[in-house]
Amino acid sequence: MLSSAFIAQINEILAPDEVEKLCLTLTETMPPVSIRLNPKKLLTPPSKCPSPYVEPQPSSGAFDLLALKDGRVPWCSQGFYLKQRPTFTIDPLLHAGAYYVQEASSMFVEQAYKRILAESEPQTLLDLCAAPGGKSTLWRSLLPDGALLVANEPIRPRAHILEENLLKWGHPDVVCTSAFPAEFARLKEFFDVVAADVPCSGEGMFRKDPNACAEWSHKAVAICAQRQWEIIRDIWPALRTGGFLVYSTCTFNQKENEEMLVQICRELGAQLIEIPVEKAWHIAGSTLQSNARPMPVYHFFPHLVRGEGFFLALLQKTSGTANHQEFKSKSHSPKRFGMKETFFKTSTSKFVPTTEPQTKSSKTTKRPAPKLDPTTCLSESQHFQLLSTGETIFAVRQTLFQEVQQICSTVKTLHAGIPLAELKGTNLVPHPALALSSEFNTNAFPTIELSYPQALAYLRREALTLPANLPKGHAIASYLSHPLGFLNNLGPRANNLYPQNWRIRNL
């Protein structure tokens, strides 16, 4: 049930007949279902099983996602609508990062990126409020290889969800951080683009989230607007002069949208940039009643577009001056993410324990640091340099190494580049996310092609019966040629190495 206060607010920005249509849409229709494909993991089932260790079995119970397609999202090249909402959790390809379930309206950021390209080619982009990762994975697919995406989420539980989705998406040129906007102020004019999908009152998501409808109030709108202003003000020093701010919300009201943009332009120094759109998309413009030239802003109203409520504007920073008190806190030590050029050494064995097996007649013989030949794990390892934090080793593109180190030494970093390996006890083992990387060399390990039931069992972290001819050691668990993760074949049994916190808990 929509509150009378909310309806009164909508009457201030829309004509009466439009208000009625919007309210009916919000209360009596279901939101459309849409997905976006991963261009580096295209959904093209192989004509034959690539693994010599097991023959593919009938995909009992599997659904064909491509058969559910119901047209393209017109403003996103990889976006598709579906005829119905399947149970995505039981599709192994979702867990492989082959696609992302994303609300269609929010895919409009692709058009903002195209407009930015008309002015410059951004090399550094910060997605400031990024969880759960829909827009971040889209930004990463839009940016060219060699450009850096920093995906940030200050709330730690949400940050780990963001990290999981980014790792499954598999692009190497990503840093995932968990910091508040003011902490980035030390990175003066570092980013070419800042995308801020700021926390809002959630009016555009009433169909998806009944709680947002129940909790809505004018007070909540005012609180959100104040928070949004603080977020943009705090991040402003990190955006280079001439760089771009992509500001978005999932709400309709002017206080969180048009009025916020006026404040940003006036107090921080920015200008609004127009984004070309097609009339057939039915995207609305500014709701401000003014005789002046309409603001170039983009409203997605659910009764007009096939999507949820969404608002976006593109701004260009014209001034670096702002009344800003620089955030001061204990900096993160650069040693946390340190260079490890000598850590890896060529070895005939991919993963070698740090100690010899101990017997009754011998003492443990210590070895140097664990050895791994990274050239066997990455398809183009010559382009990457190594970082370590704690017991995890990451591979970072050489051309981005300096920037990544600067970020890691400034804000809390969850991962940087490709998680390559981690130390477990005395053994160096492949990181679970390595198998999901688009740079992963699948020839480095034997591959076992799983049937649909086997893939679900693997994703539940259940034990699997492996073919007798599968070599001992680490192997790739794959479904329709998309790696899901690793197994460790011990001979009579195999350890399922799928991460505990990623497993499917309920079917």
Question: At which residue positions do the language-model features occur?
Answer:
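Conserved AdoMet
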Residues: 33-45, 65-107
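Mobile active-site "lid"/loop adjacent to the S-adenosyl-L-methionine
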Residues: 157, 192-234, 250-257, 282
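S-adenosyl-L-methionine
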Residues: 154-188
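Polybasic, low-complexity RNA-engagement segments
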Residues: 1-42, 62-64, 318-507
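A short acidic, Gly/Pro-enriched loop at the edge of an enzyme's catalytic core
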Residues: 121, 185-195
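Conserved SAM-binding loop of SAM-dependent methyltransferases across substrates and taxa
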Residues: 132-145
